[in-house]
Amino acid sequence: MANHPIDQELTSPAEEELTPREIVAKLDEHIISQKNAKKAVAIALRNRTRRKKLDPEMREEIYPKNIIMIGPTGVGKTEIARRLSKLCGAPFLKVEATKYTEVGYVGRDVESMIRDLAVISMNLVKQEFRTKVEETAKQKAEEALLDILLPFPGENKHGSGQITGFATSSTLADEEDRKTHFLETREFMRKKLKTGKLDDQEVELDLPNPSVSQVPMLQVFGAGNLDDLDNQLQNVLGDILPKKNKKRKLKIPEALKALEESEAEKLLDPDKVQREALRRVEEMGIIFLDEIDKIAGREGKSGADVSREGVQRDLLPIVEGATVNTKIGPVKTDHILFIAAGAFHMTKPSDLIPELQGRFPIRVELEKLSREDFEKILTAPCSSLTRQYEALLSTDGIQLEFSLDGIQEIARIAYDMNEKHENIGARRLNTILERLLEEVSFEGPDLPESQRKVRIDGKYVTDRLQGVIQNKDLSQYIL
Protein backbone atom coordinates (compact mmCIF):
# COMPACT_ATOMS: atom_id res chain seq x y z
CA MET A 1 0.00 0.00 0.00
CA ALA A 2 1.35 3.43 -0.93
CA ASN A 3 2.56 5.79 1.75
CA HIS A 4 0.18 8.68 2.23
CA PRO A 5 1.25 12.18 3.30
CA ILE A 6 -1.33 12.11 6.05
CA ASP A 7 -2.27 8.84 7.72
CA GLN A 8 -5.13 9.70 10.02
CA GLU A 9 -7.13 7.09 11.82
CA LEU A 10 -10.64 6.97 10.48
CA THR A 11 -13.11 6.43 13.23
CA SER A 12 -16.80 7.01 13.52
CA PRO A 13 -17.91 10.43 14.74
CA ALA A 14 -17.62 11.01 18.46
CA GLU A 15 -20.62 9.09 19.62
CA GLU A 16 -21.98 10.63 22.75
CA GLU A 17 -22.89 8.30 25.57
CA LEU A 18 -26.50 9.38 25.32
CA THR A 19 -28.99 7.76 27.67
CA PRO A 20 -32.43 6.85 26.27
CA ARG A 21 -33.88 9.87 28.10
CA GLU A 22 -31.33 12.19 26.47
CA ILE A 23 -32.02 10.68 23.03
CA VAL A 24 -35.76 11.32 23.49
CA ALA A 25 -34.99 14.91 24.57
CA LYS A 26 -33.00 15.48 21.38
CA LEU A 27 -35.80 14.00 19.26
CA ASP A 28 -38.27 16.28 21.09
CA GLU A 29 -36.40 19.28 19.64
CA HIS A 30 -37.61 18.32 16.16
CA ILE A 31 -40.63 16.03 16.56
CA ILE A 32 -43.84 16.75 18.47
CA SER A 33 -45.66 14.03 20.42
CA GLN A 34 -45.08 10.28 19.69
CA LYS A 35 -43.43 9.47 23.06
CA ASN A 36 -43.78 5.69 22.64
CA ALA A 37 -42.07 5.65 19.24
CA LYS A 38 -39.26 7.86 20.51
CA LYS A 39 -38.71 5.58 23.50
CA ALA A 40 -38.53 2.50 21.27
CA VAL A 41 -35.88 3.94 18.93
CA ALA A 42 -33.95 5.47 21.87
CA ILE A 43 -33.68 2.05 23.52
CA ALA A 44 -32.59 0.49 20.19
CA LEU A 45 -29.84 3.10 19.80
CA ARG A 46 -28.69 2.75 23.41
CA ASN A 47 -28.51 -1.03 23.01
CA ARG A 48 -25.98 -0.52 20.22
CA THR A 49 -23.77 1.45 22.59
CA ARG A 50 -24.19 -1.24 25.26
CA ARG A 51 -23.31 -3.98 22.77
CA LYS A 52 -19.99 -2.30 21.87
CA LYS A 53 -18.83 -2.60 25.48
CA LEU A 54 -19.27 -6.38 25.61
CA ASP A 55 -16.58 -8.96 24.90
CA PRO A 56 -16.45 -10.11 21.23
CA GLU A 57 -18.01 -13.51 21.90
CA MET A 58 -21.11 -12.10 23.58
CA ARG A 59 -21.27 -9.17 21.14
CA GLU A 60 -21.73 -11.54 18.20
CA GLU A 61 -24.73 -13.16 19.87
CA ILE A 62 -26.70 -9.94 20.42
CA TYR A 63 -28.82 -8.80 17.48
CA PRO A 64 -30.78 -5.57 17.09
CA LYS A 65 -34.51 -5.69 17.84
CA ASN A 66 -36.15 -4.42 14.66
CA ILE A 67 -39.06 -2.01 15.00
CA ILE A 68 -42.33 -1.63 13.12
CA MET A 69 -44.12 1.71 13.38
CA ILE A 70 -47.86 1.81 12.78
CA GLY A 71 -49.58 5.12 12.16
CA PRO A 72 -51.14 7.42 9.55
CA THR A 73 -49.06 9.52 7.19
CA GLY A 74 -47.54 12.76 8.42
CA VAL A 75 -47.25 11.91 12.13
CA GLY A 76 -43.44 11.65 12.26
CA LYS A 77 -42.49 8.06 11.36
CA THR A 78 -39.83 8.96 8.79
CA GLU A 79 -38.58 11.99 10.72
CA ILE A 80 -37.93 9.92 13.86
CA ALA A 81 -35.74 7.48 11.93
CA ARG A 82 -33.93 10.28 10.04
CA ARG A 83 -33.15 12.25 13.20
CA LEU A 84 -32.01 9.07 14.92
CA SER A 85 -29.44 8.40 12.18
CA LYS A 86 -28.08 11.94 12.53
CA LEU A 87 -27.67 11.50 16.28
CA CYS A 88 -25.26 8.60 15.82
CA GLY A 89 -23.74 9.56 12.43
CA ALA A 90 -24.86 6.20 11.07
CA PRO A 91 -25.31 5.21 7.42
CA PHE A 92 -29.06 5.64 6.87
CA LEU A 93 -31.22 4.60 3.94
CA LYS A 94 -34.94 5.20 3.44
CA VAL A 95 -36.61 2.92 0.92
CA GLU A 96 -40.17 2.08 -0.09
CA ALA A 97 -41.04 -1.59 0.13
CA THR A 98 -43.20 -1.23 -2.99
CA LYS A 99 -40.13 -0.56 -5.18
CA TYR A 100 -38.88 -4.11 -4.88
CA THR A 101 -39.97 -7.28 -6.63
CA GLU A 102 -39.31 -10.90 -5.80
CA VAL A 103 -36.49 -12.73 -7.53
CA GLY A 104 -37.56 -13.78 -11.02
CA TYR A 105 -39.69 -10.69 -11.69
CA VAL A 106 -38.53 -7.58 -13.54
CA GLY A 107 -37.38 -4.92 -11.08
CA ARG A 108 -34.97 -4.43 -8.20
CA ASP A 109 -34.39 -7.23 -5.73
CA VAL A 110 -34.25 -6.55 -2.00
CA GLU A 111 -30.47 -7.06 -1.81
CA SER A 112 -30.00 -3.80 -3.71
CA MET A 113 -30.98 -1.86 -0.56
CA ILE A 114 -27.85 -3.22 1.16
CA ARG A 115 -25.72 -2.21 -1.84
CA ASP A 116 -27.21 1.29 -1.68
CA LEU A 117 -26.52 1.48 2.06
CA ALA A 118 -22.89 0.47 1.43
CA VAL A 119 -22.46 3.33 -1.05
CA ILE A 120 -23.95 5.77 1.49
CA SER A 121 -21.54 4.50 4.14
CA MET A 122 -18.57 4.92 1.79
CA ASN A 123 -19.56 8.48 0.91
CA LEU A 124 -20.09 9.30 4.60
CA VAL A 125 -16.60 8.11 5.55
CA LYS A 126 -15.00 9.87 2.57
CA GLN A 127 -16.69 13.14 3.49
CA GLU A 128 -15.49 12.89 7.09
CA PHE A 129 -11.95 12.21 5.93
CA ARG A 130 -12.02 15.16 3.54
CA THR A 131 -13.18 17.39 6.39
CA LYS A 132 -10.19 16.24 8.47
CA VAL A 133 -7.67 17.03 5.72
CA GLU A 134 -9.44 20.12 4.37
CA GLU A 135 -6.82 22.63 5.55
CA THR A 136 -3.91 20.52 4.32
CA ALA A 137 -5.61 19.99 0.94
CA LYS A 138 -6.23 23.75 0.62
CA GLN A 139 -2.57 24.54 1.29
CA LYS A 140 -1.38 21.93 -1.20
CA ALA A 141 -3.90 23.13 -3.81
CA GLU A 142 -2.71 26.72 -3.38
CA GLU A 143 0.92 25.69 -3.85
CA ALA A 144 0.00 23.58 -6.89
CA LEU A 145 -1.87 26.51 -8.45
CA LEU A 146 1.07 28.85 -7.81
CA ASP A 147 3.34 26.28 -9.47
CA ILE A 148 1.12 26.53 -12.55
CA LEU A 149 0.88 30.33 -12.53
CA LEU A 150 4.55 30.90 -11.79
CA PRO A 151 6.55 27.69 -12.17
CA PHE A 152 10.24 27.22 -11.54
CA PRO A 153 12.04 27.06 -14.87
CA GLY A 154 11.21 23.71 -16.46
CA GLU A 155 8.65 22.72 -13.79
CA ASN A 156 4.89 22.49 -14.29
CA LYS A 157 3.25 19.42 -12.79
CA HIS A 158 -0.46 20.08 -13.13
CA GLY A 159 -0.88 22.00 -16.36
CA SER A 160 -0.21 25.36 -17.99
CA GLY A 161 -1.50 28.81 -17.35
CA GLN A 162 1.54 30.93 -16.69
CA ILE A 163 0.52 34.59 -16.36
CA THR A 164 2.82 36.94 -18.23
CA GLY A 165 4.18 40.22 -16.96
CA PHE A 166 6.52 38.79 -14.30
CA ALA A 167 10.21 38.34 -14.94
CA THR A 168 11.42 34.75 -14.80
CA SER A 169 14.82 36.07 -13.72
CA SER A 170 16.65 34.95 -16.87
CA THR A 171 18.34 38.36 -16.81
CA LEU A 172 19.57 37.81 -13.26
CA ALA A 173 22.93 36.15 -13.37
CA ASP A 174 23.34 35.24 -9.77
CA GLU A 175 21.50 32.04 -8.77
CA GLU A 176 20.78 33.29 -5.24
CA ASP A 177 19.34 36.56 -6.54
CA ARG A 178 17.19 34.65 -8.98
CA LYS A 179 15.81 32.47 -6.21
CA THR A 180 15.10 35.46 -3.95
CA HIS A 181 13.40 37.30 -6.79
CA PHE A 182 11.32 34.23 -7.61
CA LEU A 183 10.16 33.79 -4.01
CA GLU A 184 9.23 37.47 -3.72
CA THR A 185 7.26 37.26 -6.94
CA ARG A 186 5.58 34.07 -5.74
CA GLU A 187 4.48 35.75 -2.49
CA PHE A 188 3.16 38.68 -4.52
CA MET A 189 1.15 36.22 -6.64
CA ARG A 190 -0.09 34.47 -3.49
CA LYS A 191 -1.48 37.76 -2.14
CA LYS A 192 -3.23 38.46 -5.44
CA LEU A 193 -4.65 34.93 -5.41
CA LYS A 194 -6.01 35.26 -1.86
CA THR A 195 -7.55 38.69 -2.47
CA GLY A 196 -9.36 37.48 -5.60
CA LYS A 197 -7.47 39.70 -8.04
CA LEU A 198 -6.72 36.71 -10.27
CA ASP A 199 -10.27 35.33 -10.33
CA ASP A 200 -10.83 36.33 -13.97
CA GLN A 201 -7.71 34.50 -15.18
CA GLU A 202 -7.93 31.05 -16.72
CA VAL A 203 -5.53 28.15 -16.29
CA GLU A 204 -5.29 24.76 -17.92
CA LEU A 205 -5.20 21.83 -15.50
CA ASP A 206 -4.16 18.27 -16.10
CA LEU A 207 -6.68 16.43 -13.89
CA PRO A 208 -7.50 12.72 -13.49
CA ASN A 209 -10.37 11.44 -15.60
CA PRO A 210 -13.39 9.97 -13.76
CA SER A 211 -12.81 6.27 -13.08
CA VAL A 212 -14.28 3.74 -15.47
CA SER A 213 -16.77 2.72 -12.77
CA GLN A 214 -18.56 5.96 -13.47
CA VAL A 215 -18.81 5.48 -17.24
CA PRO A 216 -22.52 5.78 -18.15
CA MET A 217 -22.38 3.14 -20.91
CA LEU A 218 -22.15 0.41 -18.25
CA GLN A 219 -25.29 1.51 -16.48
CA VAL A 220 -27.33 -0.68 -18.81
CA PHE A 221 -26.62 -3.38 -16.25
CA GLY A 222 -27.83 -1.23 -13.36
CA ALA A 223 -31.49 -2.23 -13.59
CA GLY A 224 -33.25 -5.37 -12.58
CA ASN A 225 -31.38 -8.15 -10.82
CA LEU A 226 -28.03 -7.54 -12.54
CA ASP A 227 -26.48 -5.23 -9.93
CA ASP A 228 -23.84 -7.85 -9.04
CA LEU A 229 -22.81 -8.25 -12.69
CA ASP A 230 -22.65 -4.47 -13.03
CA ASN A 231 -20.35 -4.17 -9.98
CA GLN A 232 -18.08 -6.98 -11.13
CA LEU A 233 -17.74 -5.62 -14.68
CA GLN A 234 -16.99 -2.11 -13.45
CA ASN A 235 -14.38 -3.35 -10.97
CA VAL A 236 -12.65 -5.55 -13.57
CA LEU A 237 -12.61 -2.87 -16.26
CA GLY A 238 -11.50 -0.29 -13.69
CA ASP A 239 -8.38 -2.39 -13.01
CA ILE A 240 -7.66 -3.23 -16.65
CA LEU A 241 -8.21 0.07 -18.44
CA PRO A 242 -5.49 2.69 -17.94
CA LYS A 243 -6.42 5.82 -16.03
CA LYS A 244 -5.74 8.90 -18.15
CA ASN A 245 -5.61 12.55 -17.22
CA LYS A 246 -7.72 15.11 -19.00
CA LYS A 247 -6.80 18.73 -19.72
CA ARG A 248 -9.43 21.24 -18.57
CA LYS A 249 -9.45 25.01 -18.86
CA LEU A 250 -10.88 26.63 -15.71
CA LYS A 251 -11.08 30.01 -14.04
CA ILE A 252 -8.91 30.44 -10.93
CA PRO A 253 -11.66 29.82 -8.28
CA GLU A 254 -12.85 26.67 -10.11
CA ALA A 255 -9.27 25.51 -10.63
CA LEU A 256 -8.52 25.97 -6.93
CA LYS A 257 -11.57 23.90 -5.99
CA ALA A 258 -10.66 21.15 -8.48
CA LEU A 259 -7.11 21.03 -7.14
CA GLU A 260 -8.40 20.86 -3.55
CA GLU A 261 -10.50 17.82 -4.45
CA SER A 262 -7.56 16.25 -6.25
CA GLU A 263 -5.20 16.83 -3.31
CA ALA A 264 -7.76 15.53 -0.80
CA GLU A 265 -8.14 12.39 -2.93
CA LYS A 266 -4.36 11.87 -2.82
CA LEU A 267 -4.39 12.11 0.98
CA LEU A 268 -7.11 9.48 1.18
CA ASP A 269 -6.16 5.91 2.06
CA PRO A 270 -8.62 3.82 -0.02
CA ASP A 271 -8.10 0.61 1.96
CA LYS A 272 -8.64 2.29 5.31
CA VAL A 273 -11.72 4.15 4.05
CA GLN A 274 -13.18 0.93 2.66
CA ARG A 275 -12.59 -0.97 5.91
CA GLU A 276 -14.21 1.77 7.99
CA ALA A 277 -17.17 2.05 5.57
CA LEU A 278 -17.68 -1.71 5.77
CA ARG A 279 -17.51 -1.66 9.58
CA ARG A 280 -20.04 1.14 9.83
CA VAL A 281 -22.56 -0.37 7.48
CA GLU A 282 -22.42 -3.69 9.35
CA GLU A 283 -22.37 -2.32 12.90
CA MET A 284 -24.26 0.99 12.62
CA GLY A 285 -26.39 0.80 9.46
CA ILE A 286 -30.07 1.74 9.68
CA ILE A 287 -32.61 0.92 6.96
CA PHE A 288 -36.01 2.59 7.12
CA LEU A 289 -38.46 0.40 5.22
CA ASP A 290 -41.48 2.57 4.45
CA GLU A 291 -44.86 1.47 3.07
CA ILE A 292 -44.44 -2.02 4.53
CA ASP A 293 -48.24 -2.27 4.71
CA LYS A 294 -48.44 -2.11 0.89
CA ILE A 295 -46.76 -5.51 0.55
CA ALA A 296 -48.99 -7.13 3.17
CA GLY A 297 -51.53 -9.30 1.35
CA ARG A 298 -55.09 -9.36 2.69
CA GLU A 299 -56.64 -12.74 3.35
CA GLY A 300 -58.58 -14.11 0.42
CA LYS A 301 -56.79 -11.92 -2.13
CA SER A 302 -54.90 -13.28 -5.11
CA GLY A 303 -53.08 -12.01 -8.18
CA ALA A 304 -50.68 -9.20 -7.32
CA ASP A 305 -50.59 -10.36 -3.70
CA VAL A 306 -48.58 -13.39 -4.79
CA SER A 307 -45.72 -11.10 -5.82
CA ARG A 308 -46.09 -9.12 -2.59
CA GLU A 309 -45.65 -12.26 -0.54
CA GLY A 310 -42.56 -13.05 -2.60
CA VAL A 311 -41.02 -9.71 -1.61
CA GLN A 312 -41.75 -10.49 2.04
CA ARG A 313 -40.03 -13.87 1.71
CA ASP A 314 -37.01 -12.24 0.02
CA LEU A 315 -36.80 -9.78 2.91
CA LEU A 316 -36.57 -12.59 5.49
CA PRO A 317 -32.88 -13.53 5.04
CA ILE A 318 -31.83 -9.87 4.74
CA VAL A 319 -33.53 -8.91 8.00
CA GLU A 320 -32.48 -12.11 9.77
CA GLY A 321 -28.85 -11.95 8.64
CA ALA A 322 -27.25 -12.66 5.27
CA THR A 323 -24.13 -11.71 3.31
CA VAL A 324 -24.57 -9.39 0.33
CA ASN A 325 -21.82 -8.57 -2.17
CA THR A 326 -21.35 -4.81 -2.56
CA LYS A 327 -18.81 -2.40 -4.06
CA ILE A 328 -16.99 -2.18 -0.72
CA GLY A 329 -16.95 -5.94 -0.14
CA PRO A 330 -19.28 -8.57 1.36
CA VAL A 331 -21.65 -6.97 3.90
CA LYS A 332 -23.15 -9.02 6.73
CA THR A 333 -26.63 -7.76 7.57
CA ASP A 334 -26.87 -9.44 10.99
CA HIS A 335 -26.51 -6.21 12.99
CA ILE A 336 -28.17 -3.70 10.66
CA LEU A 337 -31.20 -2.11 12.35
CA PHE A 338 -34.41 -2.28 10.31
CA ILE A 339 -37.24 0.14 11.10
CA ALA A 340 -40.40 -0.59 9.12
CA ALA A 341 -43.37 1.75 8.91
CA GLY A 342 -46.84 1.75 7.45
CA ALA A 343 -50.28 3.30 7.84
CA PHE A 344 -52.06 -0.10 7.71
CA HIS A 345 -55.36 1.48 6.61
CA MET A 346 -56.38 -1.39 4.34
CA THR A 347 -54.35 -4.10 6.06
CA LYS A 348 -53.04 -4.92 9.52
CA PRO A 349 -49.62 -6.09 10.76
CA SER A 350 -50.95 -9.63 11.15
CA ASP A 351 -51.44 -9.71 7.34
CA LEU A 352 -47.66 -9.89 6.96
CA ILE A 353 -46.34 -13.44 6.71
CA PRO A 354 -45.67 -14.85 10.22
CA GLU A 355 -41.92 -15.26 9.62
CA LEU A 356 -41.54 -11.54 8.83
CA GLN A 357 -43.71 -10.52 11.77
CA GLY A 358 -41.34 -12.42 14.05
CA ARG A 359 -38.36 -10.46 12.74
CA PHE A 360 -39.93 -7.18 13.86
CA PRO A 361 -40.51 -7.90 17.56
CA ILE A 362 -41.07 -4.29 18.64
CA ARG A 363 -44.34 -2.69 17.50
CA VAL A 364 -45.15 0.94 18.17
CA GLU A 365 -48.42 2.67 17.35
CA LEU A 366 -48.09 6.37 16.60
CA GLU A 367 -50.83 8.69 17.80
CA LYS A 368 -53.01 10.84 15.59
CA LEU A 369 -52.04 14.51 15.88
CA SER A 370 -54.31 16.75 17.96
CA ARG A 371 -55.03 20.46 17.52
CA GLU A 372 -52.52 21.24 20.31
CA ASP A 373 -49.90 19.16 18.49
CA PHE A 374 -50.40 21.25 15.34
CA GLU A 375 -49.86 24.43 17.36
CA LYS A 376 -46.60 23.05 18.76
CA ILE A 377 -45.44 21.89 15.31
CA LEU A 378 -45.89 25.46 14.05
CA THR A 379 -43.82 27.03 16.83
CA ALA A 380 -41.78 24.62 18.98
CA PRO A 381 -39.08 23.08 16.70
CA CYS A 382 -36.01 25.24 16.06
CA SER A 383 -36.74 25.02 12.32
CA SER A 384 -40.54 25.17 12.57
CA LEU A 385 -42.65 26.02 9.53
CA THR A 386 -43.38 29.56 10.74
CA ARG A 387 -39.66 30.24 11.24
CA GLN A 388 -38.93 28.86 7.77
CA TYR A 389 -41.42 31.21 6.11
CA GLU A 390 -40.21 34.17 8.18
CA ALA A 391 -36.63 33.48 7.06
CA LEU A 392 -37.58 32.98 3.40
CA LEU A 393 -39.58 36.19 3.10
CA SER A 394 -37.03 38.22 5.07
CA THR A 395 -34.70 37.86 2.06
CA ASP A 396 -37.13 40.16 0.20
CA GLY A 397 -37.25 42.57 3.13
CA ILE A 398 -40.68 41.34 4.31
CA GLN A 399 -41.15 41.11 8.06
CA LEU A 400 -43.57 38.28 8.76
CA GLU A 401 -45.06 37.95 12.24
CA PHE A 402 -47.36 35.16 13.43
CA SER A 403 -49.62 36.03 16.37
CA LEU A 404 -50.88 33.46 18.89
CA ASP A 405 -54.47 33.58 17.60
CA GLY A 406 -53.15 33.23 14.04
CA ILE A 407 -51.24 30.08 14.99
CA GLN A 408 -54.31 28.69 16.75
CA GLU A 409 -56.54 29.35 13.74
CA ILE A 410 -54.10 27.65 11.34
CA ALA A 411 -53.91 24.63 13.68
CA ARG A 412 -57.71 24.49 13.96
CA ILE A 413 -58.17 24.55 10.18
CA ALA A 414 -55.51 21.85 9.67
CA TYR A 415 -57.12 19.62 12.27
CA ASP A 416 -60.64 20.12 10.83
CA MET A 417 -59.46 19.43 7.27
CA ASN A 418 -57.83 16.19 8.38
CA GLU A 419 -61.06 15.17 10.11
CA LYS A 420 -63.29 16.00 7.11
CA HIS A 421 -61.03 14.69 4.35
CA GLU A 422 -58.01 12.38 4.16
CA ASN A 423 -55.84 12.53 7.27
CA ILE A 424 -52.40 13.53 5.99
CA GLY A 425 -51.09 14.60 9.40
CA ALA A 426 -48.65 17.50 9.70
CA ARG A 427 -48.30 17.72 5.92
CA ARG A 428 -51.66 19.52 5.94
CA LEU A 429 -49.87 22.51 7.49
CA ASN A 430 -47.64 22.89 4.42
CA THR A 431 -50.69 23.03 2.16
CA ILE A 432 -52.50 25.59 4.33
CA LEU A 433 -49.48 27.86 4.82
CA GLU A 434 -48.71 27.88 1.09
CA ARG A 435 -52.30 28.93 0.36
CA LEU A 436 -52.30 31.46 3.21
CA LEU A 437 -49.04 33.16 2.18
CA GLU A 438 -49.51 32.89 -1.58
CA GLU A 439 -50.41 36.57 -1.99
CA VAL A 440 -47.61 37.99 0.15
CA SER A 441 -45.06 35.62 -1.43
CA PHE A 442 -46.05 36.82 -4.91
CA GLU A 443 -46.61 40.52 -4.24
CA GLY A 444 -44.02 40.94 -1.47
CA PRO A 445 -40.96 42.02 -3.50
CA ASP A 446 -43.01 44.79 -5.19
CA LEU A 447 -44.64 46.18 -2.02
CA PRO A 448 -43.67 49.66 -0.81
CA GLU A 449 -41.48 49.83 2.29
CA SER A 450 -44.41 50.85 4.51
CA GLN A 451 -46.35 47.66 3.68
CA ARG A 452 -43.55 45.13 4.18
CA LYS A 453 -44.52 44.26 7.74
CA VAL A 454 -47.21 41.56 7.63
CA ARG A 455 -48.95 40.29 10.77
CA ILE A 456 -50.62 36.88 10.48
CA ASP A 457 -53.40 36.94 13.08
CA GLY A 458 -56.70 35.05 13.37
CA LYS A 459 -58.58 37.57 11.18
CA TYR A 460 -55.91 37.43 8.44
CA VAL A 461 -56.14 33.61 8.36
CA THR A 462 -59.97 33.59 8.35
CA ASP A 463 -60.23 36.24 5.61
CA ARG A 464 -57.94 34.35 3.24
CA LEU A 465 -59.09 30.79 3.86
CA GLN A 466 -62.78 31.10 4.79
CA GLY A 467 -64.05 30.92 1.20
CA VAL A 468 -62.06 27.78 0.45
CA ILE A 469 -63.03 26.09 3.75
CA GLN A 470 -66.77 26.68 3.25
CA ASN A 471 -66.73 25.27 -0.28
CA LYS A 472 -66.41 21.52 0.41
CA ASP A 473 -65.49 20.57 -3.15
CA LEU A 474 -62.87 23.32 -3.37
CA SER A 475 -61.33 22.59 0.03
CA GLN A 476 -60.97 18.93 -0.89
CA TYR A 477 -58.61 19.82 -3.75
CA ILE A 478 -56.91 22.98 -2.45
CA LEU A 479 -56.46 22.32 1.27
Swiss-Prot record:
ATP binds at I32, G74, V75, G76, K77, T78, E79, D290, E355, R427. Its main location: cytoplasm. It is found in: Cytoplasm. GO terms for biological process: protein unfolding; proteolysis involved in protein catabolic process. It holds the Pfam family AAA_2. The keyword Cell membrane does not apply. GO terms for molecular function: ATP binding; ATP hydrolysis activity; peptidase activity; proteasome-activating activity. Keywords: ATP-binding, Chaperone, Cytoplasm, Nucleotide-binding. One of its GO terms (cellular component) is HslUV protease complex. PANTHER family: ATP-DEPENDENT CLP PROTEASE ATP-BINDING SUBUNIT CLPX-LIKE, MITOCHONDRIAL-RELATED (PTHR48102), ATP-DEPENDENT PROTEASE ATPASE SUBUNIT HSLU (PTHR48102:SF3). ATPase subunit of a proteasome-like degradation complex; this subunit has chaperone activity. The binding of ATP and its subsequent hydrolysis by HslU are essential for unfolding of protein substrates subsequently hydrolyzed by HslV. HslU recognizes the N-terminal part of its protein substrates and unfolds these before they are guided to HslV for hydrolysis. A double ring-shaped homohexamer of HslV is capped on each side by a ring-shaped HslU homohexamer. The assembly of the HslU/HslV complex is dependent on binding of ATP. Belongs to the ClpX chaperone family. HslU subfamily. HAMAP family: HslU. This is ATP-dependent protease ATPase subunit HslU. It comes from Leptospira interrogans serogroup Icterohaemorrhagiae serovar Lai (strain 56601). The gene is hslU.
